Amino acid sequence: MAQRVTYRRRNPYNTRSNKIKVVKTPGGKLVAQHVKKAASRVKCGDCGSALAGISTLRPRQYAQVSKTHKTVQRAYGGSRCANCVKERIVRAFLIEEQKIVKRVLKEQQDKEKKAAKKTGKK
């Protein structure tokens, strides 16, 4: 009959955080080794693609690694991918340009109205 293996921690249930791997020791015994959950890649907040240059760790482990493992040297580094940052910059620039054009057109209309009022009075 096969040797039985028991959990080594207090939780007796087969949950996602209590997974085990059965391993044979050099002495021939079967023992349970608790397996850590697999880490997932950090994703871009806009498009959801995996971020390059950032370590793949469990959330708690990010506190124990240096800042260079968690970010890249760019605006929104470690939060957004390069393509989304580029899009944001272009969008912000175009919005500012639109505001300037709107302001210039409004000033021109005001000048035309004032000129029309002056010619109407004479």
Swiss-Prot record:
GO MF term list: structural constituent of ribosome
Single Gene Ontology BP annotation: translation
Function comment: Component of the ribosome, a large ribonucleoprotein complex responsible for the synthesis of proteins in the cell. The small ribosomal subunit (SSU) binds messenger RNAs (mRNAs) and translates the encoded message by selecting cognate aminoacyl-transfer RNA (tRNA) molecules. The large subunit (LSU) contains the ribosomal catalytic site termed the peptidyl transferase center (PTC), which catalyzes the formation of peptide bonds, thereby polymerizing the amino acids delivered by tRNAs into a polypeptide chain.
GO CC terms in record: cytosolic large ribosomal subunit
InterPro entries in the cross-refs: Ribosomal_eL34 (IPR008195), Ribosomal_eL34_C_sf (IPR038562), Ribosomal_eL34_CS (IPR018065)
Keywords, sorted A to Z: Cytoplasm, Ribonucleoprotein, Ribosomal protein
Keyword Ribonucleoprotein included in the entry's annotation: yes
Oligomeric and partner information: Component of the large ribosomal subunit. Mature ribosomes consist of a small (40S) and a large (60S) subunit. The 40S subunit contains about 32 different proteins and 1 molecule of RNA (18S). The 60S subunit contains 45 different proteins and 3 molecules of RNA (25S, 5.8S and 5S).
Protein location: Cytoplasm
Organism: Candida albicans (strain SC5314 / ATCC MYA-2876) (Yeast)
Gene name of the encoded protein: RPL34B
Family statement: Belongs to the eukaryotic ribosomal protein eL34 family.
Protein name: Large ribosomal subunit protein eL34
